[in-house]
Amino acid sequence: FLLITFFCWGSIYIVSKYALAVMGPVTVGMCRYAVSVLCLYGLLKLKGGAKKIQPEHWKYLLILGGLGYFVSIILQLGGTALLSGSLASLINSLNPVVISIMAALFLKEQITWKNVVSIVVSLIGVYIILGKGSMEINMMGVLCSIGSVILWSAASVSIRKISGYYDPVQTALYGMVIALVFNVPAAVIENVFVTRSHPTAVAIGA
């Protein structure tokens, strides 16, 4: 299952490059969540259905859906459009590193020596690629990808406060539904105004 997960996650950046050649990042995100919501809804039904959300927990789901699934993924797609798929994937692989740091700061989770070594190695790897690489790098793409990492990590740490109350499938489904609510009008704006004004623009900063 881990190998399947790695394969699917890695292929996202390759598939996204093709999709972003014909659609803007917001539209790609909308299509992605439309499919995901249908799949997760069916899976949740098979698992027995949804549990009622406690009123005080909605703020965490809004953070997950708004910042995590909506803004963060649009930035990720924007970065993928402006960078090579491998470089975008490399920057976004910093998510576990930033999540560990934020969890230590805000949730008081302990960072082990193993975590420290992993963080240092990851940062050195990214520095070598970004700071010493010979290829030309689009800094707007880098900033989009880094912004995506920060927002996704913040949303991931925030949702941990209620992770023990609900099935992960339900949490993901509700977060994606919230993201889709934002995505639909944003995609309309992107296609009606942005694409019409700049027909060749398919990414942030293009």
Regions of interest found by a model, annotated:
Residues 27-42, 46, 63, 115-121, ...:
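Hydrophobic alpha-helical transmembrane segments of multi-pass integral membrane proteins
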Residues 1-27, 136-161, 182-183, 201-206:
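Glycine-/small-residue-enriched transmembrane alpha-helix faces in small-molecule transporters
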Residues 14-25, 49-50, 78-85, 127-140, ...:
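Membrane-interface helix termini and inter-helical loops of multi-pass transporters
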Residues 40, 62, 102, 111-131, ...:
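Hydrophobic transmembrane alpha-helices of multi-pass small-molecule transport proteins
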